[in-house]
């Protein structure tokens, strides 16, 4: 009996122990000096953190690669890496992700990235694709901004054989200064700086040295970071004598580096396992650590100081930590250009082909129905179009960002998110016939609030407590415009409390704004066609069957009434049974949308990466000539702007895809008023992708 009781007591104690979460972060150190600092870090954290708070344990390995492998094997939890090693950590089988970033500069203006740029003199007259035979200035062999990124991006232009790499680079440029290169084996790499010294004794070494090489006239182009020219030329008039080379073979002033750079390079980053990686615990630990032992916090122990070495555990120049948004994996964190450059150097692979030999455009499709239409398009395009699938629009945008997909057509709200993620609009959907459709992008369509005529007492001013129907969270007519106007009235983001219930696909599943949705099981309230109330037609159907008000485009009611939509729920509907809510509190017939709307919305637009812009433009214009609105019989032929259900890949009422001319950034395309309205609504954003992208491009 005593044994049984004892066993029960032991089990109870063990059970209690097992129930206590492991709050230890095992930090990986790569030298004796790092291990010593890690132990000091551990001991000082013990003195300031409660016993139930996070703690540090130290694991010593021989190298950063060993640390990466140890974390992947759950033998350690965290280590700080530079960008190149973050790439290694991300690769299978390691599958690590960035969780905390070091920042530099000030707390008010934290810098977590720098931009690698190509600087030239203003009067030199050549572009990025004309660098062959020019003289080049590099910060140093093997360094990110000065070598790895530019040479990685130029890799496929280098003369073959491309190994050894130094020889190929020497044969590409007519002369170079690449400090740290072997001047005996590759004399051309040291032609502009005799000796190729690997220290500041070489006047052309490092960022400032590479710029001096350009400034002195020794070289034609300097590969440096964006701040180099500002650090070396205080006078704006002097800076104006220089320009940046852009990847699209244009030039920009040196202060426009955010839109004209070779790659965005992240600061040193703490990585952890993608699954079960303790990322919240690591952040809790480091956030408390910077509060107690950050810059100018403590004399006993300093997190960003290395008395017995340099950059131990963390960079000495760091000012603090920022939490990396959860949506951001390593590929997104590093960025497409950086990953492309490093992959080219490591694997000997080549980036996008030139415009004259465009690779197929990989179109991103949402849902089963879109994929079916895309596959049909792919077959008819004879290899010009390939198809990639994703569950949500944001997943598609992420795939385009990292090169897994190339293009898709988006509502204005998602054009905004895509723009914040570095994508660009390339063609606009036009919805009205005119003689010059492809050359004249339209001003936009109208966002309207539709109600049943029978609900005669309902106005814009008494929507509180009513049942609402939205195209999806983040979309223009269905969310951004009406919720932006509503936010200005109620000054808070609790829209699920303002309406009694609704269907706004993309809302949290337990929200009242999912209660009216009709999707079954996991498809309920999903922002794709698996949710029956998704999109313009879906939101109108929601109004017909359950809701009080639907936020849609001005064409939605006419397109789904009078027998134009043969679906059972719509075939007997009449346009006259619906009215529009006007912002002045009145109502008008559906036909009077020009005088009764919430706002003018930008037309849907095709977006892509900057490097694919020319190819997407070229191929889509070819495709619409083959399969656009000039095809009259869609029963036996593929039609780009027709769908088995509704608005698949493009809006069904699209007449053509039009050139944007100078409206080729998301700000210019959407217009200042719309960008400002969506910017205000960002306070209410639940977009994890937008959070991740603004981390990269604040």
UniProtKB/Swiss-Prot annotation:
Glycans are attached at residues 51, 630. The modification Phosphoserine is found at residues 389, 685. Hydrogencarbonate 2 binds at residues 471, 475, 477-478. SMART domains: TR_FER. The modification Dimethylated arginine is found at residue 42. Monomer. Part of a complex composed of SLC40A1/ferroportin, TF/transferrin and HEPH/hephaestin that transfers iron from cells to transferrin. This is Serotransferrin. It comes from Pan troglodytes.
């Amino acid at each position: 009996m005593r044994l049984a009781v004892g066993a029960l007591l032991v089990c109870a104690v063990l059970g209690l122990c097992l129930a206590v979460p492991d709050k230890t972060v095992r930090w990986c150190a790569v030298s004796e000096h790092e291990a010593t600092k890690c132990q000091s870090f551990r001991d000082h954290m013990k003195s300031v953190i409660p016993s139930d708070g996070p703690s540090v344990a130290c694991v010593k390995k021989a190298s950063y690669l060993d640390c990466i492998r140890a974390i992947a094997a759950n033998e350690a939890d965290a280590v700080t890496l530079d960008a190149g090693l973050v790439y290694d950590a991300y690769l299978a089988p390691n599958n690590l992700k960035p969780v905390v970033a070091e920042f530099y500069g000030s707390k008010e203006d934290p810098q977590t990235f720098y931009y690698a740029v190509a600087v030239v003199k203003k009067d030199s007259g050549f572009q990025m694709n004309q660098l062959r035979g020019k003289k080049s200035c590099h910060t140093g062999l093997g360094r990110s901004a000065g070598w790895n990124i530019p040479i990685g991006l130029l890799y496929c232009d280098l003369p073959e054989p491309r190994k050894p790499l130094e020889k190929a680079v020497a044969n590409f440029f007519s002369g170079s200064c690449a400090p740290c290169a072997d001047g005996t084996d590759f004399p051309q790499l040291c032609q502009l700086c005799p000796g190729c010294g690997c220290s500041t004794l070489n006047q052309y070494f490092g960022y400032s040295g590479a710029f001096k090489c350009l400034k002195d006239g020794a070289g034609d182009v300097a590969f440096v970071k964006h701040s180099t020219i500002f650090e070396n030329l205080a006078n704006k008039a002097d800076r104006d004598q220089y320009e940046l080379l852009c990847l699209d073979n244009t030039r920009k002033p040196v202060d426009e580096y955010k839109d004209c750079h070779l790659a965005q390079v992240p600061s040193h980053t703490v990585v952890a396992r993608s699954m079960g990686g303790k990322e919240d615990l690591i952040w809790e630990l480091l956030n408390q650590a910077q509060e107690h032992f950050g810059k100018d916090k403590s004399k006993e122990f300093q997190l960003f100081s290395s008395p017995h070495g340099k950059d131990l555990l963390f960079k000495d120049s760091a000012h603090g930590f920022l939490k990396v948004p959860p949506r951001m994996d390593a590929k997104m964190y590093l960025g497409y250009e950086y990953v492309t450059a490093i992959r080219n150097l490591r694997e000997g692979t080549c980036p996008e082909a030139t415009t004259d030999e465009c690779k197929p455009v990989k179109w991103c499709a949402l849902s089963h129905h879109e994929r079916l239409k895309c596959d049909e398009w792919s077959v008819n395009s004879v290899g010009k179009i390939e198809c990639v699938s994703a569950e949500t629009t944001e997943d598609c945008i992420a795939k385009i960002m990292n090169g897994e997909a190339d293009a898709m057509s988006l509502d204005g709200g998602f054009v905004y998110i895509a723009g914040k993620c570095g994508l660009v609009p390339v063609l606009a959907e036009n919805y009205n016939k005119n003689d010059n459709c492809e050359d004249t992008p339209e001003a936009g369509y109208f966002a309207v609030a539709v109600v049943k005529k029978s609900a005669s007492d309902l106005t814009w001013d008494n929507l509180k407590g009513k049942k609402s129907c939205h195209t999806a969270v983040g979309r223009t007519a269905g969310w951004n415009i009406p919720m932006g106007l509503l936010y200005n009235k109620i000054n808070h983001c609790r829209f699920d409390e303002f309406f009694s219930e609704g269907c706004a696909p993309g809302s949290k599943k337990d929200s009242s704004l999912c209660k009216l949705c009709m999707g079954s099981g996991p498809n309920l309230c999903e922002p794709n066609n698996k949710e029956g109330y998704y999109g313009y037609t879906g939101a109108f159907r929601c109004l017909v069957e359950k809701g009080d008000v639907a936020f849609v485009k001005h064409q939605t009611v006419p397109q789904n009434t009078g027998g134009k939509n043969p679906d059972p729920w719509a075939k007997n509907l009449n346009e006259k049974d619906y009215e529009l809510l006007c912002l002045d509190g009145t109502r008008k017939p559906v036909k009077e949308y020009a005088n009764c709307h919430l706002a003018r919305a930008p037309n849907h637009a095709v977006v892509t990466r900057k490097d694919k812009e020319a190819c997407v433009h070229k191929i889509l214009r070819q495709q619409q000539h083959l399969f656009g609105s000039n095809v009259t019989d869609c029963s036996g032929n593929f039609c780009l702007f027709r769908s088995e259900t509704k608005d698949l890949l493009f809006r069904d009422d699209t007449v053509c895809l039009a050139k944007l001319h100078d409206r080729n950034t998301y700000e210019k395309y959407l217009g200042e008023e719309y960008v400002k309205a969506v910017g205000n609504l960002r306070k209410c954003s639940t977009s994890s992708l937008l959070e991740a992208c603004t981390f990269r491009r604040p």
